Design a protein with these regions (language model features):
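Glycine-rich phosphate/adenosyl-contacting loop at the front of the ribokinase-like
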Residues: 1-36, 45-49, 220, 225, ...
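Short beta-strand scaffold segments in enzyme catalytic cores
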Residues: 24, 69-73, 207-211
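Gly/Ala-rich phosphate-binding loop of Rossmann-like dinucleotide-binding domains
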Residues: 27, 136, 247
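A glycine-rich helix N-cap at a beta->alpha junction
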Residues: 52-65
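Conserved phosphate-binding/catalytic loop of the ribokinase/pfkB sugar-kinase fold
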Residues: 73-109
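Conserved phosphate-binding/catalytic region of the ribokinase-like
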Residues: 152, 180-294
Length: 294
């Protein structure tokens, strides 16, 4: 075993996290978004500066713990990428309450609210069941993209749209989700439970299944024009495209088609670098849609 230094080159440094990535993607598509996020200590202040420099509208919640830093390592010979995400700060009860209040206040200025990512330590698993009625009270619609124990707990409250990747969907139903048929069973379960109006289960290189009360739509991913470099941020790019098009008046299927294309475009950039809008819109024309009745 060789032991020594591994030299690295810093290619890209940016503010990140699910909601921030979505806000960046919305801006890339020409939409308007406000990122609501926590910021703690020195790294939290740097996060605020990065967002300001990038011109992303944001509302920080100051917390006692230090904001975490995540890393994507891209190995240039194998072209493999490794997403390293350390544990984040723990929020206390007061910070959790202030977080709810801040989300509700920001929601009033937007027709759609995206709740993205796993919950930080300190927040109860049922946090999103508290978020959902507050969002409804503002007249906004909630799009939920979460994972871990918060995912099944969130089913107790209806939202407008839910996105699960195949791993999260498998966690929900207790079995592997690998095909469009598997995804259809998951989406049917979510719709039948009244947990959502629109259910989206993503299937990696296959694409995604978008389901509503009117039927199921298989959205087959377009062929990539180049070698995939990283899947970090692909899900956030998808949600950004979907919410942008929903806010512009598109129906969920057309919005999801651009979402599948944005996820594909995200894979063509290394690390967490954002997708190219023109590439995403070009790939959207190659997304094949197969409509199935319920």
């Amino acid at each position: 075993m060789d032991i020594g230094k591994t030299r690295a080159r810093v290619r890209y440094v940016a503010a990140g996290g699910g909601g921030i990535n979505v806000a960046r993607g919305v801006a890339r598509f020409g939409g308007r978004a406000t990122a609501v996020h926590t910021a703690g200590q020195e790294i939290g202040q740097r996060l605020n500066r990065l967002l300001d420099e990038e011109g992303i509208d944001h509302v920080p919640l100051e917390i006692a713990g230090e904001t975490r830093e995540a890393f994507v390592l891209f190995e240039t010979e194998s072209h493999r990428s490794y997403h390293i995400v350390p544990r984040g700060p723990r929020l206390d009860d007061d910070e959790g309450r202030r977080c709810l209040d801040l989300i509700e206040q920001a929601a009033g200025a937007h027709p759609y609210v995206v709740a993205s990512g796993s919950l930080p330590e300190g927040l109860l698993d049922d946090f999103y069941t508290a978020v959902a009625p507050r969002i409804r009270g503002t007249g906004s619609r909630l799009l939920l993209d979460t994972s871990g124990p918060a995912l099944p707990e969130s089913l107790h409250e209806a939202v407008y749209l839910r996105r699960c990747n195949r791993s999260e969907a498998g966690y929900l139903v207790g079995r592997a989700v690998q095909s469009f048929d598997d995804a259809r069973a998951v989406n049917e379960q979510l719709l039948a439970a009244g947990a959502t109006e629109v259910a989206i289960t993503t299937l990696g290189e296959l694409g995604a299944l978008c389901s509503t009360g009117q039927g199921h739509m298989e959205l087959h991913a377009p062929p990539l024009p180049g070698e995939p470099l990283s899947d970090a941020g692909a899900g956030d790019g998808m949600i950004a495209a979907i919410v942008t098009r929903l806010a512009a008046g598109d129906d969920p299927v057309d919005a999801c088609a651009l979402g599948v294309a944005a996820a594909a475009a995200s894979m063509l950039t290394p690390g967490t670098e954002p997708f190219d809008r023109e590439v995403a819109e070009s790939l959207c024309t190659a997304v094949r849609i197969n409509r199935l009745a319920r």
